[in-house]
Amino acid sequence: MKHLEQRIHALLNADAAATLAGIRRGIEKESLRITTDGTLAQTPHPRALGSALTHPYITTDYSEALLEFITPPSTELHKPIEFLEQLHRYVYSHIGDEVLWVNSMPCMIGKDSDVPVAQYGSSNVGRMKTVYREGLGHRYGRKMQTIAGIHYNFSYPDAFWKLNQQLEGDNAPLQDYISRRYFDLTRNFQRYSWLLVYLFGASPALCASFLAGREHDLLERFDHSLYRPQATSLRMSDLGYQNNAQSSLAISYNNLDEYVSTLTHAINTPEPAYEKMGVKVTDADGNVKYQQLNANILQIENEYYSSIRPKRTIKPGERPTTALQERGVEYIEIRALDLNPFEPVGINQQEIRFLDLFATYCLLRESPQLEKCDLHASKENLRKVVYDGRNTDIQLYNWGKSVSLKNWASEKLTQMQPIAELFDRAHGGNNYAEALAHQQEKVDNPSATPSAQILEQLESRNQGFFQFAMEQALAHRDHFLSGQRCDATNQQLEALAADSLAEQAAGEAADQQSFEEYLADYFHD
C-alpha cells in the first residue's frame, strides 16, 4: 500500500496529469445478428458491410452471425462511444429486419450446427481464420463461441512512461521498461478482476437452450431461463467448458519472455484428445477437409482464454508472440466485460472512466510475481463473485487472509481516489471522481449493479431471459434507426466497405501457395 501511495504522490507532484491526457482507448464490441423471432440469423455477412476479412471497423468474430465493431484508437474520451454509435446506425441500415442482440449470453440456439462459422473467402489467410474457428467448434462446441462481450484496449503515452521511469530511477531501454510495467499491470488485473465482474457483470441469467444437454448447477426459473440468485456474470464462468484442455495450462504473466515461452509451448504441444479428432478428414466425395489447424493444446495464440492480454499490433502474416517478442508490449486488452444490455452500445462513458482508473491502479500498485497459489486464489475469488457476488458478505482470499467482498471492494475504491484526482486534473471537472463514487454505491447497495437490475426486471415483469433480452434489443434498434446518421461517417463507411471487398479479392487473386504450404510457413519457428 505504501508503494502505491508513494507512486501516486510522486506523479501528483510531477504534474503527471498532462501525460495522462495522451492515453489511447479503443473498444471492440460483439453482437449477434438475430431474426425477429429471436433465433440466430443464418444469412451471410451482408456485402454492404464490406469484407469481414479486411474491413478495419466492422468484422465478424466466431460466427458469420457474430458481428464485431471496432473503434480506432483515440486520445479523446468521447470518441470510441460516438464512433460505436455511428457504426451501429450504419449496420442497422444494411441488415433489413434483423436485430442486434444486446446481451452477452446468446439468443435461442437449437443445435450446435445451427451456429454458422464465420467465412472469410478463399485466400489462405481467410481459410486459416475459418479453419481455426472450425477447430474451436470441435473442441469446445459452437454454442460456447456465441457468447459476446466488450474488449477495452488501452495504452499509456510514451511521455507518461518516461516520467514514471525517471521517477523510479530505472535506466533500462524504454520499451523494456514499458513491457515490464504492462506485465505488472496484467498480474494485478488478474488478482483484482473480480471487482470488475461484481461492478459490471450483466449476465446473471441465460436462455435454457444454451445449456441443453450439458451439466450445470443453475436453477430454472422464469420462462425457459436458468440463473443463480446472486450471480453477476455467468459469461465469466466455466459453464459448458468441462474437461477443457486449457484448464491445465499455466501461462506465465511474470514477464514478457515467460509469457511468450509458455504460450508458445502450448501452441507446440500435442493434445491427445485433439490428435484423436484428426486435423484433416476425407468426406464421402473424397474431398480432404481441415477441421482444425493442428492438434496442439492451442491452435494459435488467440485460443488461449484470458481476461486480459498484453498486445502488439501485428504485421500481415506475423504471429502475435513474434510481434511481442520483437517489439514489446504496446497496449493491453481488457476482456472481462459483459455487454451492458441497458446501454445501446453495451458500455457507457462512466464505465470507461472507471476502467481507466482500475487499469492505472493495477499499474501503480506493487505487483509481485504470480505463484501457483496466487493464481489459484485469483481463480477461486473470480468463481465466487461470478456465482454469488451480490452476497457481498462472501469471503475472498487476500494474500492468504480472508476478507468480505464488501470490505475489500470498498478498500480498493478508496485507494483509487487519488488516481481519480490525477485523471480529473488531466481532463478537467470531476467526472472521474463521480465515476468512482458511482461504483462505491454499487458496493454499498448490490441492487444497483447491472446483474441485480436484470434479475429485478425478470422478477417484476415475470419475464424470461429471452423476453427481457428481446425487448432491450428492439428498444436499442429503435434508438439507432431514429437517431441522426453522420453523413461524413456514412460516406467513409461506404468507401471502406467497397475498398475492403476489393482488398479481399486482390488477396485471393495474389495467392501463390497452397494452403498446406501457407500453414507450414506460418507455424515455422
UniProtKB/Swiss-Prot annotation:
It is an enzyme of class 6 (ligase). The keyword rRNA-binding does not apply. Pathway: Sulfur metabolism; glutathione biosynthesis; glutathione from L-cysteine and L-glutamate: step 1/2. Keywords: ATP-binding, Glutathione biosynthesis, Ligase, Nucleotide-binding. Coiled coil: none annotated. GO terms for cellular component: cytosol. The keyword ATP-binding applies. This is Glutamate--cysteine ligase. InterPro entries: Gln_synth/guanido_kin_cat_dom (IPR014746), Glu_cys_ligase (IPR007370), Glut_cys_ligase (IPR006334). PANTHER family: GLUTAMATE--CYSTEINE LIGASE (PTHR38761:SF1). GO terms for molecular function: ATP binding; glutamate-cysteine ligase activity; metal ion binding. Pfam families: Glu_cys_ligase. It comes from the Bacteria. Belongs to the glutamate--cysteine ligase type 1 family. Type 1 subfamily. Its EC number is 6.3.2.2. It catalyses: L-cysteine + L-glutamate + ATP = gamma-L-glutamyl-L-cysteine + ADP + phosphate + H(+). One of its GO terms (biological process) is glutathione biosynthetic process.
